Amino acid sequence: MAMGPDVVRIAAVSDIHYSKSSHGALQPLFAQITESADVLILPGDLTDYGLAEEAKVLARDLTTTVKIPVVAVLGNHDYESGQMGEIVKILADAGVKMLDGDTFETHGVGFAGVRGFCGGFGRGALGAWGEPIIKQFVHEAVNEALKLESALARLRSDHRIAILHYAPIRDTVEGEPVEIYPFLGSSRLEEPLSRFEVTAVFHGHAHKGKPEGSTANGIPVYNVSHQVLKACYPDRPAFRLFELRTSSAETDAGVTPIADRRHWGRRSTDRGSTAPQQAQEENPSPS
């Protein structure tokens, strides 16, 4: 089937935890992503200890190797040293689209991103009751959900991609100790996703979770933590690659994971009217 400019390839990997000594560590991975995708998503934990020096190392590797748009949100590790503002500035100056209740559109696809927060899922979610510190904890999750809702509402693209660090559903954190589920995400983040008919959701944070799940309304959710990808797909480079058809006739097609590395090759915007075989849908391995 012909692969024209109405097909966008999205690469995603989270929790890369760049340190001061990480220079060059992921450049081979970034080079393959640049060759294969039209957009790269980085859903948080960009640095290990939340240091500006770590962000500078990542910025150098990205500017040297990645020649496609990069869209990112911060993760909890990026907050560790209180240097979030510096990290955002360093990466933004390097060309990364840093989202925090913001949006970005490219190739006919709209991206909305927030960090998200904790609180748990479903009937096990923490309620705003009791001590002020508990209410403050819950209100942080509520505020992140409201920021996500506001960002999604501003998108005018037919295809909307949500980028989070924390999980919006329980499915993709299964495999982690159940005792820490409340600290891995919040189902409050799920509500805006369904309201605005999001095409797909990408998150990280849960290093021992599952790579795929879905919201109650069937929206696909992908845990693209670097650690999950290495564990679940040991025979592949540690990033996920997806195709999204953006033609008006296929607005409901959603994203299709690409499993067969023979179909990775050049990104769609370079392929013009060439006609490789249609990529096969990926069957997720158990976590």
Segments from the language model and where they lie:
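Active-site-proximal segments of metal-dependent phosphoesterases and phosphodiesterases across multiple
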Residues: A59, L126-P132, L155-E197
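Metal-dependent catalytic neighborhoods of phosphoester/phosphodiester hydrolases
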Residues: S22-L26, L46-T63, L74, Y79-A94, ...
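Binuclear metal-dependent hydrolase catalytic cores centered on His/Asp/Glu-rich metal-binding motifs
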Residues: V109-S157, P182-S187, P237, L244
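N-terminal active-site segment of His-dependent metallophosphoesterases
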Residues: M1-I68, D78-G82, I134, V138, ...
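Active-site neighborhood of phospho(di)ester-bond hydrolases with catalytic His/Asp-centered motifs
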Residues: A12-S14, L40-D45, V70-N76, K97-G101, ...
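Active-site-proximal beta-strand elements of phosphoester/diester hydrolases
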Residues: V7-H17, G108-G120, I161-I163, P220-H226
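Binuclear metal-dependent phosphoesterase catalytic core
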Residues: A2-V7, E105, E179, S187-T199, ...
